[in-house]
UniProtKB/Swiss-Prot annotation:
Origin species: Clostridium perfringens (strain ATCC 13124 / DSM 756 / JCM 1290 / NCIMB 6125 / NCTC 8237 / Type A)
Any one GO cellular component localisation term in the record: cytoplasm
The protein, known as: Uracil-DNA glycosylase
This enzyme's EC code(s): 3.2.2.27
Keywords recorded for this protein, A-Z: Cytoplasm, DNA damage, DNA repair, Hydrolase
Main localization category: cytoplasm
Length: 225
């Protein structure tokens, strides 16, 4: 579980894999994958970092931990595999995208095309037991993903950080470089979306910022499959 990303994250994160917290996390995960049903597949844990190299990151959308239902999680925050029903929070994201930018609501929740455009779809915890939300909280992943955020904060090219909900907003303390843009609101979950997520226009705000720094805006439209 010391990963190879096959991009610039390899050099940036290589020291993390030697640290005591990560070695303990690795031991824990080896046992969990042997004895429990864990999501995502161990081959998908680091997909966010594999698909979106450090130098290419334009936007970060922080999630909490992976979906814990069968066949949902595949290493990207909020995204589900093709053929899997779109979860409620992602449905609300698509509703906001529709009202914000006029994107049609797709028949799937597969967000890989966002990752390929420079959106780092990063959960703060990268694994979970099936049916047990937050079951891998406090095992070491937070230290690892905080390091990812710290490295992004150091970058000299601006990044948009999208922080939805208390867990994500708590990471704002790591984003100290004033060149970056922070967009935050309540979570798109049905429990909170009507209290400030709907109407917050995060997608057009992101594109407006990217255009202002002479970057290509994101094509947010997820195509039907």
């Amino acid at each position: 579980m010391a990963a190879e990303f096959n991009n610039d994250w390899d050099d940036l994160l290589k020291d993390e894999f030697e640290k005591e917290y990560y070695l303990n996390l690795r031991k824990f995960l080896i046992n969990e994958y042997k004895t429990q049903k864990i999501h995502p597949s161990m081959y998908d844990i680091f997909n966010a970092l594999k698909f979106t190299p450090y130098k290419d990151v334009k936007v970060v959308i922080l999630g909490q931990d992976p979906y814990h239902g069968p066949n949902q999680a595949h290493g990207f925050s909020f995204s589900v595999k093709p053929g899997v029903q779109t979860p409620p929070s992602l449905r609300n994201m698509f509703k906001e995208l529709n009202s914000d930018l006029g994107c049609y609501i797709p028949n799937n929740g597969f967000l890989e095309s966002w990752a390929k455009q420079g959106i780092l779809l990063l959960n703060t915890v990268l694994t979970v037991r099936e049916g047990q939300a937050n079951s891998h909280k406090g095992k070491g992943w937070e230290i690892f993903t905080d390091r990812v955020i710290e490295l992004l904060n150091k970058r000299e090219e601006p990044i948009v950080f999208i922080l939805w909900g208390r867990n994500a907003i708590s990471k704002e303390a790591l984003i100290t470089n004033s060149i970056h843009k922070i967009i935050k609101s309540v979570h798109p979950s049905p429990l909170s979306a009507t209290r400030g997520f709907f109407g917050s226009k995060p997608f057009s705000k992101t594109n407006d910022f990217l255009v202002s720094i002479n970057k290509e805006p994101i094509d947010w439209q997820i195509p039907n499959i």
